């Protein structure tokens, strides 16, 4: 069974309630229908019920009726969620009138449904920008305990079985924080390891990547990686992590043994933490395009409950996979 199938099966075995705020978006609705057909998750669609069911009929989506459909402009908990938002944001000057307006926004409403305990995760972004998706998540759900930095991981399914776990690698940050400081980079390492375990089922072996291996080069950007490694070890002493390592030393046993003898990670890494967003974004796209790897994500991490962001160029299959991944993150969050 391939990894995506394993992710889907784990979701089926422990169904989570996933909110889809873009309930009338075509790819989202078609993926939702397949999720409901396959029994992968319980779905909450936000939007006008008549419009959603009309589109489902038009597109031949016979299982959308199995979803819970909530109209942001008319539902029983509207005032309850507005009061919750007002309380959460009162120090920022939120009024009840302002909260009542924001509750009509599906992206805010979805996060409030999660915060109230009425859902387990959210997926959006087929229509909305990353900023629009993240803003309510950070205002309402907030970051996970001990974490101040949201980041994004990419699941890479490569054709190099000698690397990672039979070619499976997880890389972060590829999506959110442009130039992390040492503390943020340590948090990215911790969160990417958690994502690797929760989503890919890996026993994380984390490499902090650089252009230097164990002091082979001197530069302030190398110093940042070394400091981040120290902080990450303090945050999670049980985590298998090492650095700084060049990419070949992290992935290739022969090179790892030569450049970093005695390292438990060198040549065996399945989680790659890059020093900045620029490196992460370029790297995964090179692996995807030149190495013909399958890149799944980005998977947002560091938020107290899973909220994921789609590319506006996503396919129906992308939405399907990300619903299953969001469900896996929700399962892991409950187990912590």
Regions found by a protein language model. Name each.
Residues 1-266, 271-336:
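Anion-binding alpha/beta catalytic cores of soluble intermediary-metabolism enzymes, centered on
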